[in-house]
Amino acid sequence: MVMTDPIADMLTRIRNANMVRHEKLEVPASKIKREIAEILKREGFIRDVEYIEDNKQGILRIFLKYGPNNERVITGLKRISKPGLRVYVKAHEVPRVLNGLGIAILSTSQGILTDKEARQKGTGGEVIAYVW
């Protein structure tokens, strides 16, 4: 089966595993998915991410994070720019998610960045997703 939007597939897998409170999930790896997962880890939305070599494209194993009373850390995940409708923003238009409580993930000329990093570097790009 041909997958038209692998990033949306990854975000949906994270959202679904989070809803049923799974400890971990696996997604087919790619460079952009790996960078998105590293941002989620750095921003504290997931516990850990590891790359598993399987002599094909590899697998990303993502360990989800929950609060002390088993409450979800990720309350929302939304794909913004899709293959059929790309969404680009200029440096001064970089969006804020929930007034700074969430993050926007952007693909820029300087790599995959959060909205805060893009504002600091003064760069715009394609808005991949919102996470809150």
Swiss-Prot record:
Function text: One of the primary rRNA binding proteins, it binds directly to 16S rRNA central domain where it helps coordinate assembly of the platform of the 30S subunit.
One GO process term, biological-process aspect: translation
Subunit (UniProt): Part of the 30S ribosomal subunit. Contacts proteins S5 and S12.
GO CC annotations on file: ribonucleoprotein complex; ribosome
Key words, A-Z: Ribonucleoprotein, Ribosomal protein, RNA-binding, rRNA-binding
Family to which the UniProt record says this protein belongs: Belongs to the universal ribosomal protein uS8 family.
SUPFAM superfamilies, alphabetized: Ribosomal protein S8
UniProt protein name: Small ribosomal subunit protein uS8
Keyword rRNA-binding attributed: yes
Single GO MF annotation: rRNA binding
